[in-house]
Amino acid sequence: MTGVSHFSRVSKRVAALNPPHLRAIFSPYGWTDMYRDLYYHGGIFNHGFMSHWVKSNGPHFRTRNTLKEKWGEARYGQAIKAALGDPEISAVPYLVDALSHPDDGANSMLVDIIVNNLCNEFHRERSVNFENCKIPAYFGGDWGLYGLHLPGDIRAIEKWKGPKKLTIGPPVYLDRPLYQYAYESLRWFDHWLKGIDTGILEEPPIHLFIVGANEWRGAEEWPLPETKWTPFYLHAGGLLSEHEFWPQDGSSSYEDSPHHHGEIEFKTPPLVENTEICGPIVLNLFGSTTAMEILWFVSLWHFDAKGHGSLLTRGWLRGSQRKLDPAASRPWQPFHQHTEREPLEPNKIYEFNIEVRPYGIQLKQGERIGIKIKSADNDPANNYLELVGIGHVSSDSASTVTIQHNADYASHLLLPITKGNRIGTFISGGNLPPVKRP
């Protein structure tokens, strides 16, 4: 079996059943967790992709209303009524129209996702079950599809139990039918279907394209074994550095409302050496809000020596769904339960562990890494890949959001440093102190 996107997801789900006549799959670009990868990023509903996809199929595209059949008219109607009463949903006209006309076109697909806003059986039964998957599998993607397929293929390489390979390429949109992977797929299938020695299993199981260096590197496992997990702490004045805190550090705030979405930016000093960042990323924040809910939208940026910024990847988290699954979480990879919402107490400080989707980049001397934090994704997209990562709901009420960064609450960005910073030189900024002459 082979294919990308929907076909990749189907291939993975079929292969996970270990059918005796399936020899191998070549299935890059395919999400594996319907809730986390696609529709509810960090528990925040992402309607942008689904709305675009439904519209692109035309007005005559229809789907069977399986959820209505399963639940019955009464329960289905109550769920729709509750969704229409959610201010985040009712603020989006397209979603209101779909909920008001659930039997029109493909609206039932959208309604099913809206009314199942927690990670429940609806999402799990449509995701990949990794418990006993032994079929040889080839996964892949690119750094730019962080809002759709990237996390699914990385999860697959970690959890798949049979022979496996992974290729993560540069952030570009590949042409259909993905002819760029044709030669690699032939090598994979020639080995498993024809017994031809193509040499593909003698190569490292993982190949990653490093942006900036513009070259490929091999790896034996994910995350990379040589990773130096380095915390970069948030400071007053928008500084991001390895220094844990200074006496003057306190907190930073921004205002958020339907009419104005404020933000805070933190950047490192210019790096003093070429530095490679490759792997999972997490932002551990201590923060509060004047409201009972907060939506965290985090973006990771690269700034060149002239100060021009480029978006790399994003992370999200609904504050009321901050509860972690301790067994599935790692320091570099928080895994949230998303099974219930626990409203926040206004002005109370909470810890939020925000997964930022992985990336691989080499930063040159004099360049910077930075983050932007806000409570909406209203910034326009520059390309299709960025477009897939936006389109979420936002809060309907005004609030003040405060981020703590001090000795008591050391908010920090945990970065996977795979080259450079051997003795911790980021903090100097590369500036030599001047000599005072008499």
What are these regions (language model features)?
Residues A16-N18, R23-N132:
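Accessory cap/linker subdomain of secreted extracellular hydrolases
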